[in-house]
UniProtKB/Swiss-Prot annotation:
The modification Phosphoserine is found at S136. Its main location: cytoplasm. Residues 113-128, 148-160 have a biased composition (Low complexity). InterPro entries: Tubby-like_C, Tubby_C, Tubby_C_CS. Transmembrane segments: none annotated. The gene is king-tubby. It holds the Pfam family Tub. Belongs to the TUB family. Residues 57-85, 98-189 are annotated as: Disordered. Residues 68-85 have a biased composition (Polar residues). One of its GO terms (cellular component) is ciliary membrane. Residues 177-186 have a biased composition (Gly residues). It comes from Drosophila yakuba. This is Protein king tubby.
């Protein structure tokens, strides 16, 4: 009986488990630095030149045992019923969809509760080991639309998973004062007072402001000079307009006007709040308020400086950025710093001289390379749904789990922007505008 069973199992028409590895055709995409091995879909399983009839799986979703099918027997001996063929087709489709789906980068995919918990646990464990800041050069891509998330050479920062509540593992700076951790110790912010005053006030500690930026590229000139609108998200899909920004047409360098009046985005408007100005190469941006450069009574104040690492050698990878802010006083007010005042130094000069007494330095959180998805990943906790080189999170080196600001794409012209203490809406919006601007030396 045993000999009969062994003979039966050795017959070529039987379905049997196999650990043999076949050399599958590599994906059509190529890169200079890394070869990408990936499944291209169900047709991948029948396009192998070594054995067109062999099916081999590396995983067993849903408890399905990997099998290898050999149909080298005579046609009369390996005729299978239609139901068996349909089952194999369903198996191929299920395995293919299981391997191609990822957790958050596909906005239409619904992740089960246990998968969300497992994803959050993995990301929490990963976040407890902060990586050293990589002073590498940013990638050389200037395109907004990253429809393929598996290009290794042009890998943008993309979401790494979803969680039941945003920022669940982000510790607040004031946790020692009893503000607590994550969403349990903070509330969602709302507009207090007039809009023009609110957008300039630093966010209170323990408050998270969830915002949305929409880009309007409709019209004659808006393809090159789009208008950006910032809204504060509220419950039930409601939103409150905060700021609007546009790029000035006649300017030697990139110059953005920011106003709380969406109908008049000019420097002479009553709602003018400030501006964002870059250097010639687009590697450094300075944010100013609406003060007068020549005035001594209300001089123009520096609100922030954004510096992007240059990419002279053309190294590929996510952008690296440094953000310098004015320091905060004991009563949570910004230190007044003015580069227009000849008696004091601006934020950029203080940072270059390593005089950090009255300034705060932030960095973008270093994304982690994921070999499975062949891309850089960050955990945006459900607030970002599409891959883009513009996606980033700002943190302080002393507390990499406290996300001061995060920004990322949700659709072609819609982006989310969330910020906390010590940023104000004007600072956060200007930082986001700098990521939209083209950068000659960074791309």
């Amino acid at each position: 009986m045993e000999a009969y069973i062994r003979q039966k199992r050795a017959s070529p028409g039987m379905v049997q488990a196999s650990d043999l590895q076949i050399n599958r055709p590599m994906s059509g995409m190529r890169s200079n630095s890394r070869e990408l091995h990936a499944y291209d879909g169900p047709m991948q399983f029948i396009s192998s030149p070594q054995n067109p009839d062999q099916i081999l799986t590396n995983g067993s979703p849903g408890g399905i045992t990997p099998v290898a099918v050999n149909t080298s027997r005579n046609h009369s001996n390996n005729m299978r019923s239609l139901s068996t063929i349909n089952q194999e087709a369903d198996l191929i489709e299920e395995i293919s969809s299981h391997e191609l789906e990822d957790e958050e980068s596909s906005p239409v995919t619904v992740i089960e509760q246990h998968q969300q918990s497992a994803s959050h646990s993995a990301n929490s464990t990963q976040s407890q080991k902060p990586r050293a800041r990589q002073h590498s050069f940013s990638d050389n891509l200037d395109e907004d639309d990253y429809t393929n998330r598996n290009v290794a050479a042009a890998a943008p920062v993309r979401p790494a998973g979803m969680a039941s509540s945003p920022y669940k593992d982000a510790t607040l700076e004031g946790s020692s004062n009893g503000t607590g951790n994550g969403t349990g110790g903070e509330s969602e912010g709302d507009v207090i007072g007039n809009i023009d005053q609110f957008v300039m006030q630093p966010a209170p500690q323990g408050v998270l402001y969830k915002c949305r930026i929409t880009r309007d590229r409709k019209g004659m000139d808006r393809g090159l000079f789009p208008i950006y609108y910032l809204h504060l998200e509220r419950d039930y899909g409601k939103k409150i307009f905060l700021l609007g920004g546009r790029k000035r047409k006649k300017s030697k360098t990139s110059n953005y006007i920011v106003s709380c009046d969406p109908t008049d985005l000019s420097r002479n408007a009553d709602g003018f709040c400030g501006k964002l100005r870059s250097n010639v190469f687009g590697t450094s941006f300075t944010v100013f308020d609406n003060g007068n450069k020549e005035s001594t009574e209300s001089p123009r104040l520096d609100l922030a400086v954004i510096i992007y690492d240059t990419n002279i050698l053309g190294f590929k990878g996510p952008r690296n950025m440094t953000v310098i802010l004015p320091g905060m006083t004991e009563d949570d007010q910004r230190v007044k710093i003015s580069s227009a005042d000849p008696k004091q130094q601006g934020i950029l000069d203080l940072w270059k001289m390593k005089n950090m007494d009255n300034i705060v330095e932030l960095h973008n959180k270093t994304p982690v390379w994921n070999d499975e998805t062949q891309s850089y990943v960050l955990n945006f906790h459900g607030r970002v749904t599409q891959a883009s080189v513009k996606n980033f999170q700002l943190v302080h080196d002393s507390d990499p789990e406290y996300i001061v600001m995060q920004f990322g794409r949700t659709s072609e012209d819609v982006f989310t922007m969330d910020y906390r203490y010590p940023l104000c809406a004007m600072q956060a919006f200007a930082i986001a505008l700098s990521s939209f601007d083209g950068k000659i030396a960074c791309e």
